Structures are given as structure tokens and as C-alpha cells.
Amino acid sequence: MDVNPTLLFLKIPAQNAISTTFPYTGDPPYSHGTGTGYTMDTVNRTHQYSEKGKWKTNTETGAPQLNPIDGPLPEDNEPSGYAQTDCVLEAVAFLEESHPGIFENSCLETMEVIQQTRVDKLTQGRQTYDWTLNRNQPAATALANTIEVFRSNGLTANESGRLIDLLRDVMDSMDKEEMEITTHFQRKRRVRDNMTKKMVTQRTIGKKKQRLNKRSYLIRALTLNTMTKDAERGKLKRRAIATPGMQIRGFVYFVETLARSICEKLEQSGLPVGGNEKKAKLANVVRKMMTNSQDTELSFTITGDNTKWNENQNPRMFLAMITYITRNQPEWFRNVLSIAPIMFSNKMARLGKGYMFESKSMKLRTQIPAEMLANIDLKYFNESTRKKIEKIRPLLIDGTASLSPGMMMGMFNMLSTVLGVSILNLGQKRYTKTTYWWDGLQSSDDFALIVNAPNHEGIQAGVDRFYRTCKLVGINMSKKKSYINRTGTFEFTSFFYRYGFVANFSMELPSFGVSGINESADMSIGVTVIKNNMINNDLGPATAQMALQLFIKDYRYTYRCHRGDTQIQTRRSFELKKLWEQTRSKAGLLVSDGGPNLYNIRNLHIPEVCLKWELMDEDYQGRLCNPLNPFVSHKEIESVNNAVVMPAHGPAKSMEYDAVATTHSWIPKRNRSILNTNQRGILEDEQMYQKCCNLFEKFFPSSSYRRPVGISSMVEAMVSRARIDARIDFESGRIKKEEFAEIMKICSTIEELRRQK
């Protein structure tokens, strides 16, 4: 179906045409190789911004640390990290004055959360630095390893299952003279294969015990591993992001809980809400400024950009903020919240894999690990790398760099937003005590500033005052990258505002198309994306209908499942034609089996299997929904699954879609090659962990599953649950006496085995 593109522009207000300026087609750039160079850049830049601070040596780890707090006041427009403690505290105090009781209430909410949060909160999240193996792992595995090591070192508070008790173990672990850990390693030996009589390399996995002294353990506990941020568009250079270990994560989580609770109560905060809710919140602030700028007043808006937000923030400043926010709270609460910023003041950045060298003439490749950078001869490196290494050398310890100032990306988004909002809050007339006043929006490092004044000089003065106030707390507004406009047109967190937020539908374009999970999920995700964009992004009915037809076309080409009566020849067409001919009700065939498309914009919310169920031949129904089909490894599919969709900007979003389990919901098998590496032990641990969790969920279906409050183990909980259920089933006649007796016997056996162990 071809559409004349000029038709799309009839009757559209100009601002809605923003979607046509979309530059990002094709795949975003991904990084390859090592991130060591980018990490060194970050470390060196951060120290440069704070270079006039004071140097100290950490007595425990021997790491040199730079403290820029209360450093010299800036004399130029260069970015700097010299935040002034008294200014930060005063800004936060005024924020409380404008919002009476806000900190008090947020502290109470956070205390409640701390009491109830379970350890498994930390299993959420992707790659995590696993300090026991000194590399990245999935969060669940890293947590399991940490707990295992803690227990074998006599730290057992975590057995209660509460996160706060695991954190108690973390604190105790830092006082221990040594920690014993288990590491995985790989042995290779050459053996003769019995069948082929050739020599082959056989790999075996070993586990060995290793002792870390206090200093080595502390360095690992304070380490953030670094990686290169992938899929960033519109940048020539890549940059490094950090992933902290399990010791830091729990503390950060509680600090962010407190900060999130505060942000929810601040009208200028773009976090933690998102989507339409965020747009509504922001539109309110703009409306307030426009209605209050009477006819005599001018109103201008800055679409703001801050220079290197993270690298100029300072954990010591966050410590001061937390100390103030929690000032009337119980001692234990203040201690728990102050640990994260203290750990960040002493953090170490792991430099990653190191550098790869290759000699073209000798066809040799060799890896220089980060640990060797401290004393390798620099003649092997090019000019720019040599400079980087020279600069970072004084900071190196065991392949990690001491990085006291700066925050690393994405660590304290909520708390830094509170700091930003507290500066916006100072724009009220009762604080500026003059004719200009300001307000605005803040979301992590992104901001929009609205300034009102009787004339242009007033606007200029207001902007200058805002700029200087920010400098005092380590926020550097970039004069080059920010621009000012009459209020009514600005951009904030990729939302474009023009007399109301404009739907920028093109942002969602990359998420249209076939995801490549499997036939069942892809169909469901595809139509859900179109449905969601009709709801949220002004995707009109005609365009949606066109998107749907393009999607079906794309889907058929991807899975080679053109209609059974088509002339197109593919690898599958012989089988699909045969199926088409022997099917009585052809409308009942799924699109992936060569059937027709029955979707239109009115029924996108119905899964395809349900849409066609009544139209299917009976034997086709039986084949399609057959859990015993040996060719399909069935996951137990819940009614709702999550897919990851990629918008053009910003992080990948998780999107729910309906999942109906059919023989099309196949899961590709895992690559075998991993089973021969030292990952194997880890993989087995992970599967075991998974099995335990699945079993536990069988006993406690979500409706009845209240988080256990006592300190019973998972096994005890399941056994007692089994006994209760068996008794109920026996008394209501659902199971026989023999079955009841057998269940009771199994329960007793399990308890006996636990006692013996």
C-alpha cells in the first residue's frame, strides 16, 4: 500500500511536524574492545575539575584522595567541583522552609521501607561487579556469591532475609582482618581422544580458596567496575559507566529511596515519574509561570545543559545533605544513610580489561592488563595514551584508580535532583528580594529554567544569579550548550514543549518492527507497540493502520510465513502451502503459519491466538496449544511478559505484552560453548538459584505470598506450607488418607536431613 507523503501534512500544526526531522535511522553505535581508555579519561577529567582541592592519603587502603569541598570560589566560566558546604546546606534548608515537613515525612516513609525490604531487592538489575571473582556477573549471581562468602566467614546476620541485616554484615566485613573467598579457575591439559586418537585440550574447572587481607578486601568492596556505554547516538566519543559491587548497592538503594520520596513531593522534579504523568507535572510549572507573568512582565525559558554533572558532584556534599535532611531522626537511620556517600568518597574505579597490542609483522597479539599499567614502559603507547597513563599513575593501586571526587554515571540520580531543585526553589521573589524571579524543572542533570522579569535587563540579571548560585554547589551550567527562548518553546528530557508538550512520535520509531524473540512474542510485541503509540504518542488511525500493514509485511519476511495462497517462494512455502490446503477454516491459521492477518486498529489488544481461536480447525487447535509437543521447550508463560524496546533516545524501556503459550513460543537453546569455560560453575550456581526460586513460588502463589517476616529459611517455610495445605486438602476430601500420610512423611524426612546437615 503506497501513501502519498504530502497527504500526511494536511491540517497538521507546525509543531507536530517535529517527527519528520528524525535523524536516527539504522543501528546505534556499539563499543568494541576495552573501556580502559574511557575510564582513564573520566578519572583524569574528574581530578582536573577539582585540582585545587586538598590531597590526603586514605589510612586503610593507602589511596591518595583529592577533596575539593570548600575549595576556591571560581574566577572564570570553566567547570569546577568546588561546592561550598554552607551554601548547599542553606539551599536545602530553604527547600524545607518552602515545603514544611517534607524531610520529616520522607524519613518516616524510608524507615518503613528499610524495615520491610528483603535481600532479594538486590537481585534486580543487570551486570554487577562481583568482588569475589573480580569481574561482572548478573546481579542475582553476584548477590548469591557475596552471601555465600559472608556466611563462610562467619557473617550470618543476612540469614534473616532482610536487606538491613545484610548491610550489617557488610559493615562487619570491613572490620575483619581477613576474608576467605572461593575463586573459579580453569585447568587445561592435553589428552589423547580415545575415538579419534588426536590430541585435544581438556578443560576442567577448579575452585580454590584465597585469603584477602583487610586492605585488599576494602579495595574490592569500594570498587566500581567500569564498562563502555553502548548505543549512544549523536556522540563521536564513547564514555565509561560504572557498576558498583554488592557492598555499595544496598546502601545506595536506601539513600535513593529517601531521595525518591522527597522528589515525589517536589513539583519541579522530573523524577521519579515518567511518560504522561511527567508531562502533566511539568506543564503545571510552565502554566504557573505563564499565568503569573502579568502583561507587564517578560518570561523566558532556558533549555539547559550542565557540563559534566557527575564529575563535578561530590559525595561529601551528599553526605552533608543527608546529615541535614535526617537531623532529627534516630541514630541508626542516620548511620545507615550516611554510609553510601562515605563509601563513594573512598571509591576506586576499576580500569577494565587493559590494552590489546598486536604486532602486524609477527602476527602476535597480547593483552596488557590494567594491573600492569602502573609500571610498564610507556614507549609502547601512542602520545595520547601515554599522557593519560602518566596522569593516572599516582592514583593506581592493584589495577584500580583512586577516585574520591565525582559520582560516576547514574548513581545518585534522585539525590542530585533534590540538590538541583533546591537551587530552583531559591528563585522565589521572597528569596531573590528583587524584581526578577525564577522557577523550573530538574531531572537528574537535565534542567529547564523559566525566568520572569519586568524587562530584558532583569531577565539577564536573573540568569546570571542562577548561574552563580549553581556554581556554589558544584553545578556548572554550560553557557555554550544552553539556549534561551520566549517561554512557550523549550525542550526538557527529550520532551518538546510548544504551548503544551508535542508528541514526538519519531522517538519511538526504532521500537517498531520485529523483535526477533520468537514468532509468538514478536507478533504480540509488534501490535502492542502500535497500540501504545496510539494511546500515548498521537499516532493517528490512518498512520496506525499503515504501521500495522508494514509490520505484518516485515513479520512475514522475517519468519518466511507468507500467506498459503501466495506466489512467493521461500524455504517454508512448501510446508505452509500444504497446511493451507488441508485447513478447512483458513482464517483460523496464525500469520506465522501462513494465515491471513485479522488485526486492525480496533482489536490490537487481543492476542492473536484468542482472536482466531473460534475460527480454528479442531485438530489445528490441538497441535497449536499442546504442552507435550517435544519440539518446544516450554517456559511456564505467565499471562503477561516483558519485552525490552529501544526508543531513539534514553534507556531501553520495558514494555508489557500479553503472552499466550503456544508451540510458537519456542526458546532458543543456550550456546554450548559456555559449558566448557570457567563460567560453567557460575552457570550451574545460577540455575540452582533459579530452581530454588521457582520451587518457592510454587508453594507460595503470588496471591497468598506475603513476604516472610520471621527468620525461617525458605525450606522451613515451604515445609510448613506443605503441611498446612495437605491438612486442608485432606479434611475437605480432595486427597486420600494414604496421600496425606505420604506428604507428612516427606516433610519429616526433609526436616531430619536439615538437622543432620
Curated annotation (Swiss-Prot):
What this protein is reported to do is described as: RNA-dependent RNA polymerase which is responsible for replication and transcription of virus RNA segments. The transcription of viral mRNAs occurs by a unique mechanism called cap-snatching. 5' methylated caps of cellular mRNAs are cleaved after 10-13 nucleotides by PA. In turn, these short capped RNAs are used as primers by PB1 for transcription of viral mRNAs. During virus replication, PB1 initiates RNA synthesis and copy vRNA into complementary RNA (cRNA) which in turn serves as a template for the production of more vRNAs.
Description of how the protein assembles with itself and partners: Influenza RNA polymerase is composed of three subunits: PB1, PB2 and PA. Interacts (via N-terminus) with PA (via C-terminus). Interacts (via C-terminus) with PB2 (via N-terminus); this interaction is essential for transcription initiation.
Q: Where is the RdRp catalytic domain?
A: 286-483
Instruction: Name the domain of life.
Output: Viruses
Q: Where is the motif named Nuclear localization signal mapped on this chain?
A: 187-195, 203-216
UniProt entry keywords in alphabetical sequence: Eukaryotic host gene expression shutoff by virus, Eukaryotic host transcription shutoff by virus, Host cytoplasm, Host gene expression shutoff by virus, Host nucleus, Host-virus interaction, Inhibition of host RNA polymerase II by virus, Nucleotide-binding, Nucleotidyltransferase, Phosphoprotein, RNA-directed RNA polymerase, Transferase, Viral RNA replication, Viral transcription
Q: What else is known?
A: SC35 was derived from A/Seal/Massachussetts/1/80 (H7N7) by serial passages in chicken embryo cells, thereby acquiring a multibasic cleavage site in its hemagglutinin (HA) and becoming 100% lethal for chickens. SC35 was then passaged 11 times in mouse lung, yielding the mouse-adapted variant SC35M.
Q: Name a GO molecular-function annotation.
A: RNA binding
GO biological process annotation, one example: viral transcription
- Which Pfam families does its entry note? Flu_PB1
As for PTM, the annotation reads: Phosphorylated by host PRKCA.
Name the UniProt record assigns to this protein: RNA-directed RNA polymerase catalytic subunit
Reaction catalysis annotation? RNA(n) + a ribonucleoside 5'-triphosphate = RNA(n+1) + diphosphate
Q: Which organism is it from?
A: Influenza A virus (strain A/Seal/Massachusetts/1/1980 H7N7)
Chief place where the protein resides: host cell
Signal peptide limits: none
Which lineage ranks, top first, belong to the organism behind this chain? Viruses, Riboviria, Orthornavirae, Negarnaviricota, Polyploviricotina
Where it sits in the cell: the answer is: Host nucleus; Host cytoplasm
| EC numbers | 2.7.7.48
Q: Which Gene3D superfamilies match?
A: 6.10.140.720
